[in-house]
A protein has these predicted regions:
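Membrane-embedded transmembrane alpha-helical bundles that form the catalytic cores
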Residues: 2-420
Length: 420
C-alpha cells in the first residue's frame, strides 16, 4: 500500500493544464448527475479524496499521514463538543475546545522557530490553515446554537471539499450543507456552468499570464536591482512594492476563480473571495473586497466576539476605544496566522492601526459635516474627484502593506552573510 502511494504523481492544485484536464474529466459526471437531480455521494467523495491525495504526494507520505491524524483529531473535538453542548455551556470548555482545534496549526507555525535550519513541522500539510478555519468555525457555531445536529459524513464532506481544500475560499458549514442538499434547477445549473467557464478563462488570464508577467518577468529583476542598490528604501524597491502587490492579487484571485469554477461544477456556490479590491475608497472597504471569506470569518468569529466580551466586562468606557482595540487585536491575530515572522505581524499591526485611523477619519468627517450644516454650509465634497483621491490613497497604502507582507524588506534591511 505504501509503495502505491509513493508511485502516485504529484499534482499541484490548479498548477497546470494537465491538472485541469484530469479534474474536469473527474467532476463532469457530478455535473451531469446534478442536471438530472441526482447526486453521487460516494463518487464525489472518491474524487475529492483522490485529488487531495495527489496534491499531497511527493518525496514522502508525511502530508497524507498528517492529514489523516488531523482529521481524526478534529472529528473527535467537534463531536465531543457537540455532545457536550446539548446539555451544558461552560465558557472554559468552549475556550479549551477552540484552543485544541487551533493547536495543530499553531504547532506547524511554531516548529520552524524551534529548529536551527527552520525545518517545517512533520505534522503540517497543504491546506491545514483553511481546514482549521472550518473546524473552529463549526465549534463556534455549535456553541452559538446555529449548528445542532449533523452527521460525521456531513462534517467530513464539508472539511474535505476538494475545490477549496488547499487555499479556500473559507466556507461555513450551514451555507455549504444547504447548497449540497438542495440541487439547483436546470436553468440555474446552466448559469453556474456559464459562470464556471467565465471563472476559468479569467483565472487563466490572471494566474498564468498576468501573475507570470508581474511575479516572474518584472518582480525578480526588480528585487535583484533593489538589493544591489541597498539602503532603507530605493526606487527599485518602489517597483518591487507595486509588482509584488499586483502579482499577489492576480495569483491568488486566479486561484480563487478556479476554486469557484470547480465548486460550481459540483453544485456548490462557494463564497467569492475578491470583488475589485483596488476600487476601494478606504481601508475598511478594502477589507470588504479583499480575501472576503477570510476577512468576514475574522469579523464574525474574532472581531465581533471580542467587542462583545470587552463591552460585557466594561473594559473600556468609550465604544470607539473598544472597537479600536478590537481592530488591532483582530488584525494582529490575522498577521500571526500568516506566520510568526516580524513582517507578517507588522503587516497585521499596520492594517489594525490603519482601520483605527480610517474609523477616526469617518467620525471626524461626520462631525465636520454636522458643524458645517449648523453654520448653513454645504458638506465636505463627495464627488468623483474625492472618491478618486480616496481610491488612489487606499491603493498606495495597501501596496505599502503588501511590500511589508512580502518579506522583501527583511532581505533588504537584514541581509544574510553569504554561505562559505
Amino acid at each position: 500500500m505504501i509503495t502505491i502511494f509513493h508511485q502516485l504523481p504529484h499534482l499541484e492544485a490548479y498548477g497546470n493544464p494537465q491538472y485541469f484536464f484530469y479534474l474536469i474529466l473527474a467532476v463532469l459526471p457530478v455535473f451531469i448527475g446534478l442536471f438530472f437531480k441526482r447526486r453521487f455521494p460516494i463518487y464525489e467523495a472518491l474524487v475529492s479524496l483522490a485529488f487531495i491525495i495527489l496534491m499531497l504526494t511527493g518525496k514522502d507520505l508525511n502530508q497524507i499521514i498528517s492529514l489523516l491524524a488531523y482529521v481524526v483529531w478534529q472529528v473527535v473535538l467537534v463531536f465531543a463538543y457537540q455532545l457536550y453542548r446539548k446539555k451544558y455551556d461552560n465558557n472554559w470548555v468552549f475556550y479549551i475546545s477552540v484552543f485544541l482545534a487551533i493547536l495543530p496549526l499553531a504547532w506547524t507555525k511554531v516548529t520552524p522557530l524551534m529548529t536551527i535550519d527552520n525545518h517545517q513541522s512533520l505534522f503540517g500539510f497543504l491546506g491545514i490553515s483553511y481546514l482549521t478555519f472550518r473546524a473552529v468555525g463549526t465549534i463556534m457555531e455549535v456553541r452559538d446554537g446555529v449548528l445542532k445536529e449533523f452527521s460525521l459524513w456531513q462534517f467530513l464532506r464539508f472539511m474535505l471539499f476538494m475545490p477549496t481544500f488547499s487555499s479556500g475560499p473559507i466556507d461555513r458549514f450551514n451555507r455549504f450543507n444547504e447548497d449540497y442538499e438542495n440541487i439547483p434547477e436546470r436553468d440555474e445549473l446552466l448559469d453556474m456552468l456559464e459562470e464556471s467557464v467565465h471563472y476559468l478563462m479569467l483565472g487563466f488570464l490572471y494566474k498564468f499570464i498576468l501573475a507570470y508577467i508581474f511575479g516572474t518577468l518584472l518582480l525578480i529583476p526588480l528585487k535583484e536591482m533593489a538589493l544591489q542598490m541597498g539602503g532603507i528604501f530605493n526606487i527599485a524597491t518602489l517597483g518591487v512594492m507595486y509588482t509584488y502587490g499586483l502579482d499577489l492579487f492576480f495569483d491568488f484571485a486566479g486561484y480563487s476563480m478556479f476554486a469557484l469554477a470547480i465548486s460550481n461544477l459540483m453544485g456548490i456556490k462557494s463564497p467569492v473571495n475578491f470583488n475589485q479590491p483596488f476600487k476601494s475608497r478606504d481601508l475598511k472597504e478594502f477589507w470588504n473586497r479583499w480575501h472576503m471569506s477570510l476577512s468576514f470569518w475574522f469579523r464574525d468569529f474574532v472581531f465581533m466576539r471580542l467587542v462583545k466580551v470587552l463591552v460585557k466586562h466594561k473594559v473600556f468606557k468609550n465604544r470607539n476605544v473598544t472597537s479600536s482595540v478590537a481592530y488591532i487585536i483582530n488584525m494582529l491575530i490575522m498577521g500571526f496566522w500568516h506566520g510568526l515572522t516580524w513582517y507578517y505581524i507588522a503587516y497585521g499591526l499596520f492594517h489594525g492601526v490603519g482601520l483605527v485611523i480610517n474609523d477616526a477619519w469617518v467620525r471626524k468627517k461626520k462631525k465636520i459635516n454636522r458643524d458645517r450644516k449648523k453654520q448653513g454650509l454645504s458638506p465636505l465634497p463627495d464627488n468623483k474627484w474625492t472618491q478618486g483621491l480616496g481610491i488612489f490613497i487606499t491603493f498606495n497604502v495597501v501596496m505599502l502593506s503588501f511590500l511589508l507582507f512580502s518579506g522583501f524588506l527583511d532581505q533588504l534591511w537584514f541581509p544574510k552573510p553569504p554561505v562559505k
